[in-house]
Each structure stands twice: as C-alpha cells, then as structure tokens.
Amino acid sequence: MAQISESAAIPRRTANHHGNVWDDDLILSLDSPYGAPAYYERLAKLIEEMKHLLLREMEDSNHDLIRRLQIVDTLECLGIDRHFQHEIKTAALHYVYRCWNEKGIGMGSSDSGSKDLDATALGLRALRLHRYNVSSGVLENFQDENGKFFCNLTGDKRVRSMLSLLRASEISFPGEKVMQEAKAFTREYLTQVLAGSGDVTDVDQSLLREVKYALEFPWYCSAPRWEAKSFIEIYGQNQSWLKSNINQEVLELAKLDFSILQCIHQKEIQCITRWWRDSEIAQLNFYRRRHVELYFWAVTCIFEPEFSPSRIAFAKITTVGAVLDDLYDTHGTLDELKTITEAVRRWDLSLIDDLPNNIKIACQFFFNTANELAVEVVKKQGRDMTALLKATWQRYVESYLQEAEWIETRHVPSFNEYIKNALVSSGMCIVNLIPLLLLGQLLANNIVEQILSPSKIQELSELTIRLIDDIRDFEDEKERGEIASIVECYMKDNPDSTLENALNHIKGILHVSLEELNWEFMKDDSVPLCCKKFTFNIVRGLQFLYKYGDGISISNKEVKDQIFKILVDQIPIED
C-alpha cells in the first residue's frame, strides 16, 4: 500500500507509540463453548432456583439484617446481582431501610440496642448504591472523642468490619467529612493488617485477599468484570465459605454467567479486530493500534449482553478518536489540520482531496465510521439525529484544532481557557452520546439534553477524564512538544507554585469532582439509570485502565494481564 511518499519531504513530529501488543490472529482464534444453547438453559434454570433460595435465606427469621446485607454484597461482588434486583430490594433492602436510624443498625433484630459497625457500613453502602436516601452521619456513632473509629469485635470480625467501613466510605458525596475520615482511617488500618503489623494477626487468608483487592482497586477505579472474576477466585479458595450449599450454587452461577458473557465479549472483540484489520488505516504505522484496549474500556463501562451495540460503537468511536488524536497532536501540519477541520464542519470529504494519501485514509476512516454509526442511531431512536451527531463531531475536532494551534505557537493558555477547550477534547461529548443512543431505550430530546453538556453529570465526567489523563500524561506530552497541559497552565497562572503543589492542587480538584460525580450518579431524577450508569462507568473504567499508567497509549504488562484475564482466560467449570 502507498505510504507517505507524497508528504515525505514535510517534517512531521512523532509520538513514538509502540505497536499493537496483541496478535490479531490470537484474538480471531478465540473459541468459547459457552455460546451454546445448553449453557443458556442451564443459566436460566440456576437463576430461577437461586431466586427461591435467596428469598428463603433472607427471610429466615434466624438470618436478619447482617445476613441479608452479606448476601446482597456477595451477589454484587460476583457480578450477578442484575439477575436478582427484585429479590434484593423486596427481601433485603426495603427491610434494612425500615430498620435504619441515625444510630445505625444491629446484627440481629431491627430493634437491637447493640449497633454493629459491619452491619451499618454494609447497609450504608448497599442503600446508597440502590439510591436510598441515607446519611453518612450514622458513622459518627462509631467514632471516639478523638475521631478514631472503634469496633468492639476482635480478630477476623474486626478486620471484616473495617473492610466494610472502607468500602462504604468510597460512596461519598461532597462535604462528608466523616466519610473522608473513615477512608483515611481504614486504609491505614487495613494496610497494617495486610503487612502483618496491625492489632489483629493470623487473619484468614481469604479475608486478606479481599482486603488486598479493596486497597488496590477502590470502587471508583474498579471495573465490574474485573471485580467479578477476582471474587470468583477469592470465594473459590475459601473452603469455609463453600461449606454452605447456597454459596456453592451462587459460585456455580457466577462462573457460568461470567463464561457466557466472556463468550459474547470475545465475539465482539473479534468483530472489532476484523473491522480494524480490514481498514486501510491498519496498514499505516503512525497511528496507534489500540482497538483491543479500547474495546476492553467498553467492557469496563457496560458489560451486559443486551448492550452489545453500545460496546461496539464505543470501541469504534474511541479507536477513531485515537487516530484523530495522533493526527492533530503529532502527524498533521497546521494547514492540513485546518483543511480537515473545515471538511468536518461542512461534512464534505472532497475538501481533503489534495492532502497526502495517508491523511486522506485517516479522514476516510473517520467519515465512514461516523456515517455508519449515524445510520445505527437513526434506526435505534426512530428519528433523524444526524444533525446532532455532526455538530458534536464538529465541536470535537475543533477542540483538537485549538490544541494543535497551541502546539504550533508553543502557547500556554490560562487554566480556565485550557479547561474550557479540554472538556470538549476529552472526547466525552461523542463517546457518551452515540453508545448512549444505542442502549435500547428511546430517549426524548429533553432526556438527551439532561445527560449531555451543559448538564452537570456530563461536565463532571468530561472534567474528571481530562484530569485523569493529564495527571498521567503531561510529562510525556511535554516531551513531544505538547506544552499546554492542565499542569503547565496552572503553573503559568501561579508562577510561585512548584510542580508538586500544582499536582496536589489538580488531584484535589479531581477528588472533589469524583465526589460530585457520585452525587449526580446516585441522585434521583428522570434520566434512565442505564444512561447515568454508562456515563459514570466511563470514568471508572478509565481510572481502572490508568491504574498503572496510561493504559491506552502504553499497553503495559498490567493492562495486558487485565485484558487477558477478562477476555481470554476461561474459568474452569465442572460439568
């Protein structure tokens, strides 16, 4: 294929991104047996059996508040709670909420005078995640006069209570001081336990595995499929837990559910791999080849089988976004980028006819994908939404052009000027639009407006994604000549600030933004929950991928292991 011969004389910057770390032939060879009808029939049978078992277990008079909450937590950790939402609410959470008061809840009956930290923390977390209105002030009942948290239990039960408190503290809203205190206290306490230097020794190994997971992957930077696979492994090694017949059946169901979903996800990544491999752009070596990593990001956001069109769209959009990012940041000249931007403004591909072939291929890749997805949206929503989609794409590329102009002139804008543009260039404007319109629900225009900019949840998701990315990448980008980052802009506005101070300030903004995003996600409004959950999980998924660095630009060992564990590695299931 023709490469860049006609533009070889033009000096071009390069980002020196590494190549594709995945063998496309390996991806295309994946073959899971769990797509067979017999496994779906077995899953449906297990779900129905489990519904009866759960109701009987949770409504048993000998198993009151704490047992109900433990069951809910187990189902959620294993990623199978979506099958039992009715049972969870009617047999567990409605009852727990009726027993809830400002003092907390006890282990036994609803009027128990002895309040329990484990039960209260489990209840706070579960009720908030299911949008019950409960105050974090209940945790103040478990603080001494010095603000330290206490637990009257000993041994593993004490560690379990502190673990529950840590996990509850992550579901925090702005201004909740007690939640911040709980998080700081429990992280320090559990870190000591894990190191063997705490006040509890000889801790159960399975419990230590749960502690390790909670410390390494807090709720706001975890991913549902990763959590499910991890807890299948944790519970599967806990022989005392497996002594219960209901736990054995729960684990069997979780394994089968994960395997069936993995089969679906494998077929989808094969679809994306063929789409990428068959495109002309796959033959060019100056654009990042991250279709596997970007599809994996989609799985971290939304994994349920019914949302396959949204996952496919998400992977295609973000892959196109990576190509545009490389084109605008490093490969294209400013004159070429102005021509491309004008072509997108007019939605007229003929305007790029005189550009070098390699750039035309990138533009054709963009237009073909954008037009293909627009057709899918029209079919799904039953009305023409191409004007909205085009306008959103146009805003997106215009923000890239602004950044390219800053690079060309070596201009560092003010912090506020940078943020205004960066919210758009984060890509959330388009990443959160098309997949959302393909979720399966018909969304009225007013609902779309509530979700998208200038809505609060959209603005916060744009901001957090930009902050996460810039905190990780600003040094690498500076080396490539991209000097306008949130860190550099802050230091320009605050010339006396050190790099450490600037990073701490920006991390503080990120922390507050994540708490505000929690609130926007949890609060009750007219936006369908699946839409808000998708928006929220885009941020969670990116934090998960950026846990060990920029997991998209640099597909390091940790990210590759994560992808392998979720998309490739099968769980052994006994027939």
Curated annotation (Swiss-Prot):
Similarity annotation: Belongs to the terpene synthase family. Tpsa subfamily.
Q: Which organism is it from?
A: Picea glauca
Q: What is known of its domains?
A: The Asp-Asp-Xaa-Xaa-Asp/Glu (DDXXD/E) motif is important for the catalytic activity, presumably through binding to Mg(2+).
- Positions binding Mg(2+) 2 in this chain are 325, 329
Q: What SUPFAM superfamilies does the database record attribute to this sequence?
A: Terpenoid cyclases/Protein prenyltransferases (SSF48239), Terpenoid synthases (SSF48576)
User: Which reaction equation describes what this protein catalyses?
Assistant: (2E,6E)-farnesyl diphosphate = alpha-humulene + diphosphate
Q: Tell me one Pfam family matched here.
A: Terpene_synth_C
Does Metal-binding show up as a keyword for this record? yes
A single GO BP = green leaf volatile biosynthetic process
- EC number(s) per entry: 4.2.3.104
Q: How is the cofactor bound?
A: Binds 3 Mg(2+) or Mn(2+) ions per subunit.
List the cofactors. Answer: Mg(2+); Mn(2+)
- Domain of life where this protein originates: Eukaryota
- InterPro entries recorded: Isoprenoid_synthase_dom_sf, Terpene_cyclase-like_1_C, Terpene_cyclase_plant_C1, Terpene_synth_N, Terpene_synth_N_sf, Terpene_synthase-like, Terpene_synthase_metal-bd, Terpenoid_cyclase/PrenylTrfase
Q: Which UniProt keywords apply?
A: Lyase, Magnesium, Metal-binding
Q: Which GO terms describe its molecular function?
A: alpha-humulene synthase activity; lyase activity; magnesium ion binding
From the UniProt record, give the pathway where this protein acts.
Sesquiterpene biosynthesis; Terpene metabolism; oleoresin biosynthesis
Put simply, this protein is called Alpha-humulene synthase
From the record, which residues define motif DDXXD motif?
325-329
Q: What does this protein do?
A: Terpene synthase (TPS) involved in the biosynthesis of sesquiterpene natural products included in conifer oleoresin secretions and volatile emissions; these compounds contribute to biotic and abiotic stress defense against herbivores and pathogens. Catalyzes the conversion of (2E,6E)-farnesyl diphosphate (FPP) to (1E,4E,8E)-alpha-humulene.
Sites binding Mg(2+) 3 sit at 469, 477
